[in-house]
Each structure stands twice: as structure tokens, then as C-alpha cells.
Design a protein with these regions (language model features):
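Mid-to-C-terminal alpha-helical segments outside catalytic/metal-binding sites
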Residues: 19-44, 66-115, 130-132, 383-385, ...
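Distinct, well-ordered alpha-helical segments
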Residues: 168-170, 187-191, 248-250, 309-324, ...
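Short amphipathic alpha-helices and their capping/turn segments at secondary-structure boundaries
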Residues: 32-39, 166-168, 218-236, 282-293, ...
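Structural preference for beta-strand elements that scaffold enzyme active sites
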Residues: 42-43, 154-157, 173-177, 233-237, ...
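Alpha-helical scaffold segments that flank or form the walls of functional sites
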Residues: 39, 59-172, 178, 199-202, ...
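N-terminal signal peptide c-region/cleavage motif recognized by signal peptidases
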Residues: 10-13
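H/E-rich (His + Asp/Glu) clusters that bind or coordinate divalent metals
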Residues: 25, 319-322, 329-448
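Divalent metal-binding pocket/active-site signature
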Residues: 216-217, 231-344
Length: 448
């Protein structure tokens, strides 16, 4: 009976992973050949929050630099952080780390510890040695070693603020996307849910000291976008789903102007989100019209938010459907495989020519989700519209770990699809290059 049950389980597992066979089955050794092809690719990194090397080398130079990339969120989620004032940092986090190191974030941290510093695990016996090796490595040239030599990255796209200023010196290697949140949200303070013109003024005074009307505000936005383009940005980014729903309605200029004028007339009054949402929606449409005007793509955060405690339903990509219709000439690049809304994302990218998929961050959120949905994306969406790698982290150690996991996601997905006869080995190697490099170059019109 036990043997029968095992055979039944095996047959069910095979059925789950089986695909329609289109091509001849591969020749022996194809797994290794695909592995080698994937790891030979020079990557394009489509989404990072990296500080400059100078800033990084003046910051944390111990094992905690591995936790700058979301690991703290999982340790907080474990509800096991000690937070004992008299304890050492390791004593405070060790129990939570032991629980959280099983997650994708934890695995990425361990990959970095192993591959960059030759430490197999982070525990009570190794954390001091790991810190010593990290400190010894943090010297000029470290970014080149980790990003270009170890991770084999040819270009990194970083996020910059609404002033489009970047601290990275190597402008040929680091490209930038400019945040648009503040223009729509009327504030850079995304943890606030009331709005005043007085605080909005703090934001827009960066670009113009003479904003009194909605027309002035719109002119300020255009000026800021032109300034960003002049500084070399290659696109824009929106992630206001951390603070509100992505659902927007088309609002008349007249109604938006009424709200704007009320805020100007009573600048210290705190307006609720419900009161200002129509104005915010109008301004989001303005952002998209500027993307269209200047021929720039926009990345939009979809799916899981970082930090602890969020409204995940604010991030469902289907909430953006009306803007895909409204702005058919704007290239929308939807981020993070929309975890956990992968099916919805696939349907949108299949239906709309202007909707693209970027799995950035997803391989370290959940590797199995990324493998599963990459397969689904390849079966439903034209392959030129999918990009896989973006670390979405603030330290190069995190970028390295994410790069390895992104390669593994691509490798495991393609090996499974070749094994079943859906793709040939040759098709898989071509696709790997598209997923990890060529598609990103075309999506962002990169010049290497």
C-alpha cells in the first residue's frame, strides 16, 4: 500500500508539471548546457535602490549590511525580535534570524555570505568572522568587483527622487528612473494620509516658488520632467500604492481645480484622502500624459509592498486597466511579477500591447512563485515583453544574491520547459538571453 501511495503521489506531481509536448525531447546533458548558457549572460539590472559606493563604504561594514535588503521585514514578521537594550545586536536578532532565514530574503543573504565572503551560514559561531571579512572588503573598487565581476552586470537602473539627482559617479553604468509619487500625492511624506497645501508647498518649492493655481502646478510638473530628462533619466517610476489604491478615475480639470483652489485658500487645513483623491487621480493622469509627451516608459509597483503592515489589495494590477486604455502610447512596465497577482498580470500583458512584465525583486520574495509564473508568462505573453532581473535592494551584497536567484529562476523554468518538450534547447538559450538582458535593453532603449 505504501508503494502504491508513493506511485500515486509521483503521478500527481508529474501531472502538475506536465506540459503539452511541441518539440522533440532534448538530448542528454541539456540541463548543464542551459545552466552554462544562463550563467554566461551579462545581466541588465532593471531596478535598484543602491547608494553610491562612497556612501556604502562609510556605512555598515558588518553582517548587518546583509539585512538592509528586506531581511529586517521578515524578522519583524516572525515576532521574535528581542530588542533588549543591554544585549548585543546579534543577541537581539539571532532568534528572529533563525526563523526568517528560510525565506527568499534569507536565502539571498546566505548566498551573498557564501559567494562573496566564503561563509556558509550566519550564526553565533560565524557572525564575527563574517563581519570582519565584510569590513576588509569594503574599500574602493568594491562595487566594480561585486556588480561587474561577480554578478556579471553590464548596466544598473537605479531609482532617484523627483529632483533626478544621483550620487553615482559612473553614469555609463548607472542609469536612473525618476519617482513621480510626490507630483501625484502632493507630498513626499507617504506615511501621512491627510494633505495640506502648506506641506504640498514644501514639495513643489523644489521646482517652483510661484505655484498658486492648478495651471502653475501643471507647469511645475512639466518643468520638473524636462529637468529630469536633461539630467539623463531614462524613464519614470510610480509606487504610491504604498499609501493608497492604484485605482484612479478620469477626473475633469474643473473638478480637480476646485479641490486645488480649496487647498490654496486654506493652506494649513488637513484634507482627507477622500477629499483630495480626485485631484490626485487627475495629477496621475497628468504624469502619464507627460510620459507620453516625452516618450518615456514608466515602471509601476504592483503586488507586495515592503515594510510590515500593508493593504495588498491596493496593488492589484487590474486596478490600472482604465489607464492602459487611456494611454495606449505609454509603455507601462509592471514590477515584481505583481506577487501574488501573477495570473492577473499575465492577462493584462497578453491583452495590452503597452503593458510589460518585470519580475524585479520577485525571485527573492518567492523563488517558486517566480519559476511558476515565469513559465505561465512564457506560455501566455510574447517573450519580448518579459524581463526577469532587478534586485530592488539597497546594498550590492543584496544585488549579488538577487542576481544568482534570478539566474536560477530562469534556469529552472527553462530546463523544465525543455524537458517536457515545450521548448527546444536552442529556443531556451535564446530566451534566457532575452529574459536577462536583451528585453530590458529594448524596454528602456538602453545604449550600451
Amino acid at each position: 500500500m505504501k508503494v502504491v501511495n508513493l506511485l500515486l503521489l509521483a503521478s500527481v506531481a508529474c501531472a502538475v508539471h506536465a506540459q503539452v509536448q511541441i518539440k522533440p525531447l532534448p538530448e542528454k546533458g541539456f540541463e548543464k548546457r542551459i545552466h552554462n548558457a544562463v550563467y554566461d549572460i551579462r545581466l541588465i539590472d532593471t531596478h535598484e535602490h543602491l547608494m553610491s559606493e562612497k556612501q556604502a563604504l562609510s556605512g555598515a561594514s558588518d553582517f548587518t549590511c546583509l539585512f538592509e535588503n528586506y531581511q529586517n521585514c521578515d524578522m519583524t514578521s516572525s515576532n521574535l525580535l528581542a530588542n533588549i537594550p543591554s544585549a548585543s545586536h546579534w543577541e537581539n536578532i539571532s532568534t528572529a534570524w533563525e526563523a526568517a532565514k528560510s525565506t527568499g530574503y534569507g536565502r539571498a543573504s546566505l548566498l551573498a555570505a557564501k559567494e562573496l565572503f566564503d561563509i556558509d551560514d550566519l550564526n553565533a559561531d560565524t557572525h564575527e568572522e563574517l563581519s570582519a571579512r565584510i569590513k576588509a572588503s569594503h574599500k574602493p573598487g568594491y562595487y566594480t568587483y561585486v556588480l561587474k565581476e561577480k554578478a556579471k552586470i553590464d548596466m544598473v537602473i537605479t531609482m532617484v527622487g523627483s529632483n533626478a539627482e544621483t550620487s553615482h559617479e559612473d553614469k555609463s553604468f548607472f542609469k536612473s528612473l525618476m519617482y513621480t509619487n510626490g507630483f501625484c500625492y502632493l507630498s513626499d511624506e507617504f506615511n501621512k494620509y491627510t494633505f495640506s497645501f502648506e506641506r504640498a508647498r514644501t514639495f513643489h518649492n523644489k521646482f517652483s516658488n510661484d505655484v498658486r493655481t492648478l495651471s502653475d502646478y501643471e507647469e511645475m510638473m512639466d518643468k520638473a520632467f524636462r529637468a529630469g530628462i536633461g539630467k539623463g533619466i531614462i524613464g519614470f517610476k510610480n509606487s504610491w500604492c504604498y499609501s493608497r489604491t492604484m485605482q484612479t478615475e478620469e477626473v475633469s480639470r474643473e473638478n480637480a481645480e476646485k479641490i486645488f483652489n480649496r487647498m490654496v485658500a486654506d493652506p494649513k487645513r488637513e484634507f482627507t484622502l477622500d477629499e483630495v483623491k480626485p485631484l490626485q487621480d487627475y495629477l496621475f493622469f497628468k504624469v502619464l500624459s507627460l510620459c507620453e509627451k516625452y516618450g518615456m516608459p514608466i515602471q509601476i509597483h504592483t503586488g507586495l509592498q515592503t515594510y510590515n503592515g500593508n493593504y495588498i489589495t491596493n496593488t492589484n494590477p487590474t486596478l490600472l486597466t482604465n489607464v492602459f486604455f487611456k494611454f495606449p502610447k505609454v509603455k507601462f512596465i509592471l514590477l515584481h511579477a505583481a506577487y501574488p497577482y501573477g495570473g492577473e498580470l499575465a492577462a493584462l500583458a497578453k491583452n495590452f500591447p503597452n503593458v510589460y512584465i518585470d519580475l524585479a525583486w520577485a525571485p527573492i520574495i518567492c523563488p517558486s512563485y517566480s519559476i511558476r509564473y515565469l513559465q505561465e508568462f512564457l506560455e501566455t505573453v510574447p517573450s519580448n515583453k518579459i524581463s526577469v532581473f532587478g534586485g530592488d535592494v539597497s546594498s550590492v551584497e543584496g544585488t549579488y544574491g538577487a542576481s544568482v536567484m534570478a539566474r536560477e529562476v530562469v534556469e529552472k523554468c527553462l530546463v523544465a520547459m525543455v524537458r517536457s518538450g515545450y521548448f527546444t534547447e536552442k529556443e531556451a538559450t535564446v530566451l534566457a538571453n532575452k529574459l536577462l538582458r536583451e528585453n530590458a535593453i529594448r524596454m528602456y532603449d538602453l545604449k550600451l
